[in-house]
UniProtKB/Swiss-Prot annotation:
GO biological process: glutamyl-tRNA aminoacylation
Motif 'KMSKS' region positions after renumbering to this chain: 243-247
Compartment list: Cytoplasm
Presence of the UniProt keyword Transmembrane helix in the record: no
UniProt keyword list: Aminoacyl-tRNA synthetase, ATP-binding, Cytoplasm, Ligase, Nucleotide-binding, Protein biosynthesis
Record note on quaternary structure: Monomer.
EC number annotated for this UniProt entry: 6.1.1.17
Role played: Catalyzes the attachment of glutamate to tRNA(Glu) in a two-step reaction: glutamate is first activated by ATP to form Glu-AMP and then transferred to the acceptor end of tRNA(Glu).
A GO term, aspect molecular function: ATP binding
Pfam families referenced in this protein's UniProt entry, alphabetically: Anticodon_2, tRNA-synt_1c
Record protein name field: Glutamate--tRNA ligase
Gene symbol of the encoding locus: gltX
Catalytic activity annotation: tRNA(Glu) + L-glutamate + ATP = L-glutamyl-tRNA(Glu) + AMP + diphosphate
HAMAP family listed in its UniProt record: Glu_tRNA_synth_type1 (MF_00022)
Amino acid sequence: MTRPVRTRFAPSPTGFIHLGNIRSALYPWAFARKMKGTFVLRIEDTDVERSSQEAVDAILEGMQWLGLDFDEGPIYQMQRMDRYREVLAQMLEKGLAYPCYMSAEELDALRERQREAGLKPRYDGTWRPEPGKVLPEPPAGVKPVLRFRNPLTGTVVWDDAVKGRVEISNEELDDLVIARPDGTPIYNFCVVVDDMDMGITHVIRGDDHVNNTPRQINILNALGGEPPVYAHLPTVLNEQGEKMSKRHGAMSVMAYRDAGFLPEAVVNYLARLGWSHGDAEIFSREQFVEWFDLEHLGKSPAQYDHSKLSWLNAHYIKEADNARLAELAKPFLDALGIDDAAIATGPALDAVVGLMKDRATTVKEIAEGATMFYRVPAPEADALAQHVTDAVRPALADLVAALKAADWTKEAVSAALKATLAAHKLKMPQLAMPVRLLVAGTTHTPSIDAVLVLFGRDVVVSRIEAALA
């Protein structure tokens, strides 16, 4: 194919967008970027009753968060109705489409008779004009649907980039309804006109659309358009092995942001959820674009693995800039009752984040761990009784004296701890646990020397001395 590459993401704004949906944006985006082509966003909003601006906003927000920038759009199908009607009129004029007056009740009865006879239920062409055929008299007051005059013979063939060569006999296809009685065009028709007008060269979409493809190819051929390359992606399954969907508990794309995931981790994970580049598990957005091709798209359903995504997110958190993580942590801290004023009273948030991030799988976990630096500790009485015993109090007093005299560095604090342990013949947990409780209010912290340095000498000394008083 010598045409400049043009791909598209064409969601229907009828609900929230989950990872399985957004993967159908990621791959065409990556292919367009790889081929120096154009990525088009088209909003297929012809289902007026179910479409909503809220769903459109969710699509745009999710794409923006993941960095899936589009070159053209968003293009709304509802704003192209005049164009669809123009093409419908041309098809009627050329005999490519015809009015059909068969009612829904008549069609249901026909299909029931066909099922009883062991035949495939389908429209039988009652109103299809043929040479020498006498059509029924149109019923008074009935508005017809418009049907596409599908070829009666031959085969629809395409080389799917995922499924390989696909052949469908035209005998399997009936004459598709392309416009409702009120003149509103049907999805399969609008898609063809859009892809043709927009010069789409590659359609990368879920394989739930594969049954539409032969019908769309036939309409496209009838209109004189050039069929694109199709790549039908296998389904994304949830952790229970069911198709990923809202009904089966799928999270929206933005719910991952709100849970503390980084967009680069989600993009990396999604890229591997149906495509591979050798054994590479971790790669940048730039590497993904450089490596992406249609030949290595998976042919089997991909199963979502939350633990794998969490592992990737932990990796990207460790690699992330502390200042960036600090800004991302602020909304989570605010939700935990730690506002900017509280943060200003404690150690620099960048430094706190730098300490906490090596143990975290999400930004939310970083924020939860960081709260100890911005709250007055309130250790539980049982924990105090267990760890701050009469036997350890002399060691705590000596540690305070050593910390008052030490340089306030991680190395000096570590040396003071070790000297106190040796002098009192204690093991690290016997001293570190009560110190953590008294200073931080919890026994679960990163390395004790690093934590104490961040709290600052005055806070550490005053809190331990208050417990010994």
